[in-house]
């Protein structure tokens, strides 16, 4: 299998969206930690907690703890610090938490010699423009994402999670140092599930996206390694 980390293509984060440890480890044991990153979201963290994060870290994996903190600044400060203590590689907060919350999260990492990347979630890939209007925000989804991207950049965060279609413009506006993580990656034959804003791996490379998050396309595959190889080859 080609290693995307040594080529000019997006690096791959596998979303461990399972309801039990046995199923998760069945996939983890097939993966090379020098090639793939792992994402732990709310489901697995709620079931298995900090211990599971530490176990995966000890296996040599870089862990993206995707808990999307969104609370008052003091709570987010303490939660961010606690998460960083786990030795994770990347951590997410919600950009819509506002300037004070984002700055508080960034401050929480100052005492760490090797702090995790702090990433702000702009809009979920399941999010539709109509949902903005329902909560009284009368701008386009693209404009909303760009505003939150600028806010996160101004607050000193390392990057954002955003749908692929906006990534190209964000890279142009904020440069290559500002990391872009994009879920909703599908190859042609994949099901969409509940995601609306999707792109192909090839487009992700074209848009200079830094990391692509792949979940159900892999976790529900009968042959996940073959599927991953297909995804990597599609980016060549």
From Swiss-Prot:
Q: Does the keyword Lyase apply?
A: yes
An individual GO BP term: 'de novo' pyrimidine nucleobase biosynthetic process
- Ligand binding (substrate): 17, 39, 66-75, 125, 186, 195, 215-216
Does this entry carry the keyword Transferase? no
For this UniProt entry, the molecular function terms from Gene Ontology, in alphabetical order, are: orotidine-5'-phosphate decarboxylase activity
PROSITE patterns listed in its UniProt record? OMPDECASE
Tell me where on the tree of life, at the top rank, the source sits.
Bacteria
Which cysteine residues pair off into disulfide bonds?
Answer: none
Q: Which GO terms describe its cellular component?
A: cytosol
The record lists the catalysed reaction(s) as: orotidine 5'-phosphate + H(+) = UMP + CO2
Q: Which terms are listed as keywords in the entry? A: Decarboxylase, Lyase, Pyrimidine biosynthesis
Q: Where is the active site?
A: 68 (proton donor)
The protein's annotated pathway = Pyrimidine metabolism; UMP biosynthesis via de novo pathway; UMP from orotate: step 2/2
| E.C. number | 4.1.1.23
User: How is this protein organized at the quaternary level?
Assistant: Homodimer.
Protein function: Catalyzes the decarboxylation of orotidine 5'-monophosphate (OMP) to uridine 5'-monophosphate (UMP).
Q: Which family does it belong to?
A: Belongs to the OMP decarboxylase family. Type 1 subfamily.
Entry protein name: Orotidine 5'-phosphate decarboxylase
Q: Which gene encodes it?
A: pyrF
């Amino acid at each position: 299998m080609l290693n995307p980390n040594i080529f000019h293509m997006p690096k791959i984060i596998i979303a461990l969206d399972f309801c039990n440890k046995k199923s998760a480890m069945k996939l983890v044991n097939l993966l090379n930690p020098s090639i793939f990153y792992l994402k732990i979201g709310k489901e697995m963290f709620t079931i298995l907690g900090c211990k599971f994060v530490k176990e995966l870290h000890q296996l040599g994996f870089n862990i993206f703890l995707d808990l999307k903190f969104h609370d008052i600044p003091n709570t987010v400060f303490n939660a961010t610090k606690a998460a960083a203590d786990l030795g994770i590689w990347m951590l997410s907060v919600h950009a819509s938490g506002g300037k004070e919350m984002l700055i508080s999260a960034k401050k929480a990492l100052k005492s760490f010699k090797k702090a995790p990347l702090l990433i702000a979630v702009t809009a979920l890939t399941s999010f539709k423009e109509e949902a903005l209007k329902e909560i009284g925000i009368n701008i386009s989804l693209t404009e909303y994402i760009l505003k939150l991207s600028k806010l996160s950049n101004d607050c000193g965060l390392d990057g954002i999670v955003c749908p692929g279609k906006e990534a190209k413009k964000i890279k142009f506006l904020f440069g290559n140092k500002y990391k872009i993580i994009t879920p909703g990656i599908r190859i042609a034959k994949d099901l969409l599930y509940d995601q609306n804003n999707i792109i192909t791996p090839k487009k992700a490379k074209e848009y200079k996206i830094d990391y692509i998050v792949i979940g159900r396309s892999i976790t529900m595959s009968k042959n996940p390694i073959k599927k991953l190889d297909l995804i990597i080859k599609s980016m060549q």
